Swiss-Prot record:
Described purpose of this protein according to its UniProt entry: Participates actively in the response to hyperosmotic and heat shock by preventing the aggregation of stress-denatured proteins and by disaggregating proteins, also in an autonomous, DnaK-independent fashion. Unfolded proteins bind initially to DnaJ; upon interaction with the DnaJ-bound protein, DnaK hydrolyzes its bound ATP, resulting in the formation of a stable complex. GrpE releases ADP from DnaK; ATP binding to DnaK triggers the release of the substrate protein, thus completing the reaction cycle.
Name this protein carries in UniProt: Chaperone protein DnaJ
Zinc fingers (CR-type), renumbered ranges: 139-221
CDD domains: DnaJ, DnaJ_C, DnaJ_zf
HAMAP family attached to this UniProt entry: DnaJ (MF_01152)
Gene: dnaJ
GO molecular function: ATP binding; heat shock protein binding; unfolded protein binding; zinc ion binding
Cellular compartments annotated: Cytoplasm
NCBIfam families listed in its UniProt record: DnaJ_bact, PRK10767.1, PRK14293.1
Cited Pfam families: DnaJ, DnaJ_C, DnaJ_CXXCXGXG
Co-factor binding comment: Binds 2 Zn(2+) ions per monomer.
Length: 383
């Protein structure tokens, strides 16, 4: 059985991201195989790295908290068999750069792997979309305009003038890094920094593309059509693949994430898949019953008010709520709360009729005059 990730890092389940990071750094220093030569230190370090990778990522941590290991679906990188790249570090010297201010090669004189200057994935973008109440319920299509980086069509992302190509950086020999040996309390380390000549790519563009000035990407305003699924709610996030920024040096684009907010409705209130609203009826409609037309998200709907309806009665309109995302044929309900309106003013004839009705029912009628007596008289009809 897999060990609990929180126990692995010796933190509580409500630990903050900073607490998790602090705990990981402390334990990683202790168990890193370049420092700790004990048998099992490397396996422990792998477990620590995997625990940190999961718990430092909000989405993965939420899935783990809810479903445990099953919630990760095998998709979490840097597992026990994946030493390189664990916890977001490119290799062993990456983590030492993080811990020891840019020193690597703990006394081993080891050569760090060259960072490739090839294609890299573009950045994801965020777009905040405000929907009307009923747009969120029934979905549809909307056009939005975004500004993003696209691959330069002239150089196809290389940054070089057509017919030419990037040259190996002479300053770093194509490694993308420059090194300097330093002695520290931990032993002999190599200080590693990105090459200032090629910015860490290992390549230099000597003949820049005239269209993008060597950047390989250009800014563009694009209008795209978004399909909004029925049933989205405030806080929903939609993903549009490939509409983020183009990657560097011809790499694949990132994604566009659309964060949804929904305007309030003057009549309806939503809770999950259900809709709530209030309708007013007269005291006579409550006593005698009636049919009335009420507003729903589908339009006017006739409802039956049964005789003797009490104040605050809730009627259920089955299947008139919000469609379920992914299964729009299944919908929640619409709950209609009835408010019985008692008149504050009454004509002499109506008052006389109500008095006779009260006597016929054998109910005491208030002798009070004016509004106070009227309210008492009508109130007795509901008891």
């Amino acid at each position: 059985m897999a060990r609990d990730l929180y126990e692995t890092l010796n933190v509580s389940r409500d630990a903050s991201k900073e607490d998790i990071k602090r705990a990981y750094r402390k334990l990683a220093r202790q168990y890193h195989p370049d420092v700790n030569k004990d048998a099992g230190a490397e396996d422990t370090f792998k477990e620590l790295s995997r625990a940190y990778e999961v718990l430092s990522d909000d989405d993965q941590r939420a899935r783990y908290d809810r479903f445990g290991e099953a919630g990760l679906n095998g998709g979490v990188g840097g597992g026990p068999g994946d030493f390189a790249g664990a916890a977001g570090f490119g290799d062993i010297s990456d983590i030492f750069e993080s811990f020891f201010g840019g020193f690597a090669g703990a006394g081993t004189g080891g050569r760090r792997a060259t960072r490739p200057g090839g294609p890299t994935r573009g950045d994801d973008l965020r777009y905040d979309m405000v929907l009307e109440f009923q747009e969120a319920i029934f979905g549809g299509e909307k056009e939005i305009t975004i500004n993003h980086l696209i691959t330069c069509e002239t150089c196809r992302g290389s940054g070089s003038k057509p017919g030419s190509g990037p040259m190996t950086c002479r300053n770093c020999g194509g490694q993308g890094q420059i090194r300097q040996a330093r002695r520290t309390p931990f032993g002999l380390f190599t200080q590693v920094a990105a090459c200032p000549n090629c910015q860490g790519t290992g390549e230099v563009i000597e003949s820049p593309c005239p269209t993008c000035s060597g950047r390989g990407r250009n800014q563009k305003q694009t209008t795209i059509k978004i399909t909004i699924p029925a049933g989205v709610d405030a806080g929903s996030r939609l993903r549009v693949q490939g509409e983020g920024d183009a990657g560097m040096r011809g790499g694949p684009p990132g994604d566009l994430f659309i964060y949804v907010s929904v305007r309030n409705h003057p009549v309806f209130r939503r809770e999950g898949q259900d809709i709530y609203s209030i309708a007013e009826i007269s005291y006579l409609q409550a006593i005698l019953g009636s049919q009335m037309s009420v507003e729903t998200v589908d339009g006017p709907q006739t409802v039956v008010v049964p005789p003797g309806t009490q104040p605050e009665t809730v009627l259920t309109l089955d299947g008139k709520g919000v469609p379920r995302i992914g299964n729009p044929t299944r919908r929640g309900n619409h709950y209609l709360q009835l408010k019985v309106v008692i008149p504050t003013k009454l004509g002499a004839e109506e008052r006389e009729l109500l008095t006779k009705l009260a006597k016929a029912r054998g109910e005491k009628v208030s002798k009070k005059e004016g509004l106070e007596g009227l309210i008492d008289s009508i109130g007795n009809l509901f008891h």
